[in-house]
Regions:
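Alpha-helix C-terminal capping segments
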Residues: 18-19, 29, 67-78
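Conserved beta-strand-loop-alpha-helix junction that forms the acyl-donor binding cleft
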Residues: 82-93, 109-112
């Protein structure tokens, strides 16, 4: 909830919807503590990566970057990999750009 700046009930509803639509939710752990998560939708011709969130207490320590690196090495990940990032999330843009991702399309609206 804190990683997305959402109320607990909204976070639960978001995760339940993700389970219902067949997306994969990956937990990011450090020392036995879940510090974040990332959601993927793996299709035959691409993988959509979205919903990467790290708890504020653990942000800036490389957990998000490391999680993306690990995911990209998973054998069931298909390429290309697309990202869904809000324009205001400058930190995420910087991380993804540093990993070699490029902006190919911008959406005016996005919702779940």
């Amino acid at each position: 909830s804190a990683a997305f700046d959402m109320e607990k009930e909204d976070s639960i509803a978001f995760l339940e919807q993700s389970f219902d639509t067949g997306e994969t939710i990956w937990c990011i752990a450090a020392g036995g503590t879940i510090v974040g998560l990332v959601l993927t939708s793996i299709q035959p011709d691409q993988t959509n990566l979205y919903g990467l969130a790290i708890h504020p207490e653990y942000q800036g320590k490389g957990y998000g970057r490391d999680a993306v690196k690990v995911l990209l090495q998973k054998p069931d990940i298909t390429f290309p990999v697309t990202l869904h990032v809000t324009e205001e999330n400058e930190a995420a843009f910087k991380i993804y750009k540093g990993m070699g991702f490029v902006t190919t399309q911008e959406l005016m609206e996005y919702w779940y």
